[in-house]
Amino acid sequence: LVLRSGDLHITTSGALNYKLPLVDLAKIDFSSENLTYLSDLDPDSVTWTPFVGKPDPLAKALFGPRRDRSFSGGLLQLSKPGGRELEYRKGLAIQSRTQLVYRLTEQFQRFKATVGLDHRTRGRGNVDLVILGNRRELLRKTVTGLMEPFDFDLDISGIQRLTILVDYGKGKGIQDHLNLCNARITK
């Protein structure tokens, strides 16, 4: 890590270089041994329901959740004010109406992510994000393509069953590509 001219320059152990403007940095967390990305876990169940009709195998493959990539196949992207895009290497891309259920076999304390609709939706899309822990509601929020990305940090102490539901909002499934960027659970 090197701080130079208002930017944080990062070189990974694999020799990848990144430059991040400090205005985009909220905090740095070095607790990787206590951190698990949801995209590295297999959900206990995944249920995708189309707005019209019944799910078929081709549609499930097309609209099912993606790990560490967007629905267009590239990195996960969110929009910042002024049209600037932020890219993320870890996370989940989820189309409405999708429910993911994770069975947590270890004791985790926090569930954190940066959330928004994919930058490529160009301001369209409208979903309801619901997160449950042991069937108890932890978060419910409408997310639109016109919103800035937001972070959440949820207490999941004692939770064995974590459910993420991305439900249809007012747009009836059009451009409903929610990105849960850096979605992680920590001990």
Model-identified regions with their sequence ranges:
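Gly-Asp-aromatic-enriched flexible segments
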Residues: L1, S5-D7, T11-K187
